A protein has these predicted regions:
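N-terminal helical cap/lid subdomain that shapes the substrate entry/recognition surface
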Residues: 2-77, 81, 85, 98-101
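Conserved H-loop
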Residues: 22, 110-114, 142
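A short, structured active-site edge motif that brings together acidic residues
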Residues: 27-28, 110-125
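Surface-exposed amphipathic alpha-helices with a cationic face
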Residues: 76-84, 136, 156-161
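Structural signature of beta-strand start/N-cap positions in the alpha/beta core
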Residues: 80-81, 85-88, 145, 165
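Conserved phosphate-coupling serine/threonine residues in phosphotransfer and NTP-handling enzymes
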Residues: 93-95
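Conserved Lys-Pro-Asp/Glu-containing loop-to-beta segment of HAD-superfamily phosphomonoesterases
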Residues: 127-157
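Acidic, Mg2+-coordinating phosphoryl-transfer loop and its flanking beta/alpha structural elements
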Residues: 147-179
């Protein structure tokens, strides 16, 4: 829904640079979607290094990266159609709720959602499977048909792990092969 690649890449580059790595030598495209700690753990050996990189990323994302987002074409019209149909809509993102909420507000999408589901800052919920599981605890979903829509493999795997049907979209960052 949200084209966040410019801000995400900017923040990965910032964090890698602060940690002494050359960001131009790192393909960050595979880190669009997965949890931050997992992404940084691919490059740093210790938990302390991973946590420091996450901190650099988050500070820069809050100040700069979160404002470098835009909507993919057609998203607002799609959201209008879904809302007009009376569908319950929730997010299930690996971004922390505290991070995604201001982005949704800035992009004018916040009011479309009945529930903002996201990761927690303290790591207690930090992967797609757990985020979806948390969203599914909403009593308003009891007895409802649910469809997980996503653009990355972890979206599809999170749906499978929660025994949900899923629809892959290609307007985001995943490829047909990845799905």
């Amino acid at each position: 829904m949200i084209h966040s690649r410019p801000g995400i890449f900017n923040c990965f580059a910032y964090a890698f640079r602060k940690m002494g790595l050359d960001p131009d030598a790192i393909d960050c495209s595979r880190y669009l979607g997965p949890p931050l700690r997992w992404s940084f753990a691919q490059h740093f050996a210790t938990d302390a290094e991973v946590e420091q990189a996450v901190e650099y990323y988050r500070v820069h994302y809050e100040e700069v990266g979160s404002h470098q987002c835009s909507l993919f074409p057609g998203v607002r019209q799609m959201m209008d159609t879904l809302k007009d149909a009376g569908l319950y809509m929730a997010t299930a993102t690996c971004k922390p709720v505290e991070v995604v909420t201001p982005i949704l507000k800035e992009q004018g999408l916040f009011d479309y959602f009945d529930r903002i589901g996201g990761a927690s800052m303290d790591e207690s919920v930090d992967n797609k499977t757990d985020v979806i599981r948390l969203v599914l605890q909403d009593p308003r979903l009891a007895g409802k048909r649910i469809l997980m829509v996503g653009d990355r493999q972890d979206d599809m795997q999170g749906a499978v792990n929660n025994q949900l049907p899923a629809a892959a979209v290609l307007y985001g960052y995943g490829s047909r092969e990845e799905m």
